């Protein structure tokens, strides 16, 4: 499942800009990926992870502006239509799981 977070925060004063930067850094540290300037998404494995993320967002709520959450399935997220721009195909934006085992075993000898 995917959590989509959309927000608008005031940035007129230095204090408001600081709150905006702090919230954005929090989102990035939690694994959110930016789709547009104030639209982020995060891949969640199940409903328990969704509820836990909502709790962490509430604990880090900047209290000003508007923050909206929408949780959709991966199938729904994959059907997103792009009128302009391109789909982000990075590994971080994929629901495929990667497994890293041990050290780097490249062919360098």
Curated annotation (Swiss-Prot):
Give the matching Gene3D superfamilies: 3.30.70.240
The GO terms this record gives for MF are: metal ion binding; RNA endonuclease activity
- Please tell me which top-level EC class this enzyme sits in: hydrolase
Which is a Pfam family this sequence falls into?
CRISPR_Cas2
Q: What is this protein called?
A: CRISPR-associated endoribonuclease Cas2
**Known EC number:** 3.1.-.-
What InterPro entries does the database record attribute to this sequence?
CRISPR_associated_Cas2 (IPR021127), Virulence_VapD/CRISPR_Cas2 (IPR019199)
Family per UniProt? Answer: Belongs to the CRISPR-associated endoribonuclease Cas2 protein family.
In terms of CDD domains, this protein maps to:
Cas2_I_II_III (cd09638)
Keywords, A to Z?
A: Antiviral defense, Endonuclease, Hydrolase, Magnesium, Metal-binding, Nuclease
Recorded name of the encoding gene: cas2
Q: Which SUPFAM superfamilies match?
A: TTP0101/SSO1404-like
Q: Which cofactor does it need?
A: Mg(2+)
Q: List the disulfide bonds.
A: none
**Task performed by this protein:** CRISPR (clustered regularly interspaced short palindromic repeat), is an adaptive immune system that provides protection against mobile genetic elements (viruses, transposable elements and conjugative plasmids). CRISPR clusters contain sequences complementary to antecedent mobile elements and target invading nucleic acids. CRISPR clusters are transcribed and processed into CRISPR RNA (crRNA). Functions as a ssRNA-specific endoribonuclease. Involved in the integration of spacer DNA into the CRISPR cassette.
**GO process terms (BP):** defense response to virus; maintenance of CRISPR repeat elements
Q: How does it assemble?
A: Homodimer, forms a heterotetramer with a Cas1 homodimer.
Q: Where does Mg(2+) bind?
A: 8
> Where is the signal peptide, in residue numbers?
none
């Amino acid at each position: 499942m995917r959590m989509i977070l959309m927000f608008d925060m005031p940035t007129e004063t230095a204090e408001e800009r600081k709150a905006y930067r702090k919230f954005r850094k929090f989102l990035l540290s939690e694994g959110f990926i930016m789709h547009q300037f104030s639209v982020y998404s995060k891949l969640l494995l199940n409903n328990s992870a969704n509820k836990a993320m909502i709790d962490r967002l509430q604990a880090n709520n900047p209290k000003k502006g508007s923050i909206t959450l929408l949780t959709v399935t991966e199938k729904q997220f994959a059907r997103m239509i792009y009128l302009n721009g391109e789909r982000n195909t990075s590994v971080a934006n994929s629901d495929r799981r990667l497994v890293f085992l041990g050290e780097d075993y490249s062919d360098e000898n």
